[in-house]
């Protein structure tokens, strides 16, 4: 076993803080409407230019093992905020850095780290409840466009596009982002259906750059059974190979020799196949297979109605213009099913919604209607160069996540104002002892950090602006884009409540653990061993 390097107490914490600061300082230059870009070197191709906090955080690896541990823990904050709400990664990093810096000062001054952490946790729980009371529902198109605009770094066209896409496919509809061909952004609404089942084997992937399987004009085999014996499949595979089209298999499961044979056929290029599990379970799976059959003009091969897989023909297959499968979703675009049949099916499900007794059933039925009737909206991002395209696409993705979060949990005043209002409302909060009170103060002081950083990135004086905003009340704040004070909601500067909440919770979670660190252990770097003298042969 390799020798270990161990650091204790202040030595460990100083190193850890240095790593935290390197990562956070790189990320926080991107915050706010006047945040700057960061250029990331790539081992191949052009460098990537980004203003997305999590993309910057993911690039950072430090040479010093102890500093790197600090950086990696804060990277986790950005990643978690990104997974939960899809945005707010820079805010989360700024909050984490502020809590860690203030917290470690308190530890150095002799406070008990565990009580500090309890105080921080108490403040965050109270702050989350307070955020919920400040939250305003986000339902109209104008508010959705404003949230999208702020999240796309004040790009109004992106905000409007997302609001338009949500109008067309509904708030439950599926919206995807693709590379455009021109200079302008476009919005395409494609009839389609998406369900959460990915490919059964990564060997089906034919677009390695996106990690997806794309099938053009495939046949779609729908089977309400497990397929493990390849002999059942042979007639279908031969017919599809003759037709020269790809095949998508949607079945209860495809396993064993059947899956292995499909993979081998695909890799050898004999027939292009992909297999996914059918969505849902039990009766809901049968119903969803029937939905897909209606959409694609196919028939579900089910032994319950006396159909056997060996006897299936191309007439029983569904068809679609295009199918995209990634590791956890499958999207069927432009199924060839008849409009009348689709509308009939939608009517049938709506009737079931009226008769449904439980909220859960009603919700699942509404999801099915959205998938059958809503379609898929595709935002095509236009740009002059590939570098700009990548940067813009990342921003549109962020904005899309933010608007979904806003529709889900509502919005609060943006520009760091909501956290300042929460902190002032919690100024009377107390813990069980003095050290916990210091922990509460650390968390409340850290809640000013996002506003201060936004102002700093504008080249203004953070303390002056922070004090002016604190002196106001309600949604009164500082518009960093125009450098004016006013009502943030009226000025259209909104943050999704979910994004602000997630940023605060994840920042406090990781920062609290780092404050309570007393010892760090890592491998001793392997030095070059001493050169062995060459053994002479004598004489």
Curated annotation (Swiss-Prot):
SUPFAM superfamilies: GroEL apical domain-like, GroEL equatorial domain-like, GroEL-intermediate domain like
Any Gene Ontology CC annotation: cytoplasm
GO MF terms, alphabetically ordered: ATP binding; ATP-dependent protein folding chaperone; isomerase activity
InterPro entries recorded: Chaperonin_Cpn60_CS (IPR018370), Cpn60/GroEL (IPR001844), Cpn60/GroEL/TCP-1 (IPR002423), GroEL-like_apical_dom_sf (IPR027409), GROEL-like_equatorial_sf (IPR027413), TCP-1-like_intermed_sf (IPR027410)
Residues at which ATP binds: 30-33, 51, 87-91, 415, 479-481, 495
Subcellular location: Cytoplasm
BP-aspect Gene Ontology terms: protein refolding
EC number: 5.6.1.7
Disulfide links within the chain: none
Record's catalysed reaction(s): ATP + H2O + a folded polypeptide = ADP + phosphate + an unfolded polypeptide
Keywords from the UniProt entry: ATP-binding, Chaperone, Cytoplasm, Isomerase, Nucleotide-binding
Pfam family, one: Cpn60_TCP1
Subunit-level organization: Forms a cylinder of 14 subunits composed of two heptameric rings stacked back-to-back. Interacts with the co-chaperonin GroES.
Function (record text): Together with its co-chaperonin GroES, plays an essential role in assisting protein folding. The GroEL-GroES system forms a nano-cage that allows encapsulation of the non-native substrate proteins and provides a physical environment optimized to promote and accelerate protein folding.
Matches recorded under PANTHER family: 60 KDA HEAT SHOCK PROTEIN, MITOCHONDRIAL
HAMAP family to which the protein is assigned, alphabetical: CH60
Record family assignment: Belongs to the chaperonin (HSP60) family.
The protein's name: Chaperonin GroEL
Lineage: Bacteria, Pseudomonadati, Pseudomonadota, Gammaproteobacteria, Enterobacterales
